[in-house]
């Protein structure tokens, strides 16, 4: 198995893509550390995985003190960290005028600070194992969206941080890449009105949203030795959404 006895830390593991990634890495032999602010949800996911092969951590990734403590405790308890999956994220809709300073602080705290803090404090351990980082960015980090200014800014930061960290640490054997999903079927998006989901599906060449497991498969690929020469890549997992130049479909 590709991750036999490797230690994989996954943030935002209580649902959606993070939960799917936890199940994928676990199925491929990893010991998974599931980090999430939602204690009940992350405990439930951990309890559903093989006994002794999953550890749940209740954490706010925007708290750098808590993040440093978590990474050090994981490395001390499990002996190593091989993979960090920075998946925790939040979204607040609206333009810069429509959203508040608190909205920005919330998005920046989780979507940017969380990635920076987790990477910073995992890297000393990843350097020892020649491990890797996979960030969850977004197609919203590759181009702009209407009514999602802060989210686009945050995910754009993750995209370029991925490139910069790949340059800084690739020479030391640590690869850093990201996945850039479009619409994914999650607890949040499944509750959207059908007409909104239909608009997304019209922009996706495959005509549908991604299953969380489809994104998790790409995360696992990027973290595996199968991707040993991929570094600094931001991979769209979008059903062809970014293949378009933005002009309308008229045929």
UniProtKB/Swiss-Prot annotation:
User: What's this one used for in biotech?
Assistant: Could be used to improve the production of 2,3-butanediol, a valuable chemical for industrial applications, in Z.mobilis cells.
Anything known on activity regulation? Oxidation of meso-2,3-butanediol is enhanced in the presence of Fe(2+). Reduction of diacetyl and (3S/3R)-acetoin is slightly enhanced in the presence of Mg(2+) and Mn(2+). Activity is inhibited by several metal ions, particularly Fe(3+) for reduction of diacetyl and acetoin.
Question: Which reaction(s) does the protein catalyse, per the Swiss-Prot or TrEMBL entry?
Answer: (R,S)-butane-2,3-diol + NAD(+) = (R)-acetoin + NADH + H(+); (S,S)-butane-2,3-diol + NAD(+) = (S)-acetoin + NADH + H(+); (S)-acetoin + NAD(+) = diacetyl + NADH + H(+)
The record's annotation in SUPFAM superfamilies points to:
NAD(P)-binding Rossmann-fold domains
> EC number(s) of the enzyme?
1.1.1.-
Similarity comment text for this entry: Belongs to the short-chain dehydrogenases/reductases (SDR) family.
Domain comment as written in the entry: The substrate-binding pocket is formed by two protein molecules. When compared to other Bdh enzymes, SmBdh contains a shorter alpha6 helix, which provides more efficient entry and exit of molecules from the active site, thereby contributing to enhanced substrate turnover.
Q: What is this protein called?
A: Meso-2,3-butanediol dehydrogenase
* Taxonomic classification: Bacteria, Pseudomonadati, Pseudomonadota, Gammaproteobacteria, Enterobacterales
Question: Gene symbol?
Answer: budC
């Amino acid at each position: 198995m590709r991750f036999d006895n490797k230690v994989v830390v996954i943030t935002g593991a209580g649902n959606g893509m993070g939960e799917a990634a936890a199940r994928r890495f676990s199925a491929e032999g990893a010991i998974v550390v599931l980090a999430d602010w939602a204690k009940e949800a992350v405990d439930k996911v951990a309890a559903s995985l093989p006994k002794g092969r999953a550890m749940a951590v209740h954490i706010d990734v925007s708290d750098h003190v808590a993040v440093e403590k978590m990474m050090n405790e994981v490395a001390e308890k499990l002996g190593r960290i091989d993979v960090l999956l920075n998946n925790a994220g939040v979204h607040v809709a609206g333009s810069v005028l429509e959203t508040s300073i608190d909205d920005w602080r919330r998005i920046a705290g989780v979507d940017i600070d969380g990635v920076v803090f987790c990477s910073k404090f995992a890297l000393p351990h990843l350097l020892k194992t020649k491990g890797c980082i996979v960030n969850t960015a977004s197609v919203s980090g590759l181009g702009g969206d209407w009514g999602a200014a802060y989210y686009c800014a945050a995910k754009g930061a993750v995209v370029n941080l991925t490139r910069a960290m790949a340059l800084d640490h690739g020479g030391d054997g640590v690869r850093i890449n990201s996945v850039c999903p479009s619409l994914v079927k999650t607890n949040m998006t499944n509750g959207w009105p059908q007409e909104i989901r239909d608009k997304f599906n019209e922009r996706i060449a495959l005509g549908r949203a991604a299953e969380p497991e489809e994104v998790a498969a790409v995360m696992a690929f990027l973290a595996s030795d199968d991707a040993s020469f991929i570094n600094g890549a931001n991979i769209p997992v979008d059903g062809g959404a970014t293949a378009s130049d933005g002009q309308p479909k008229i045929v």
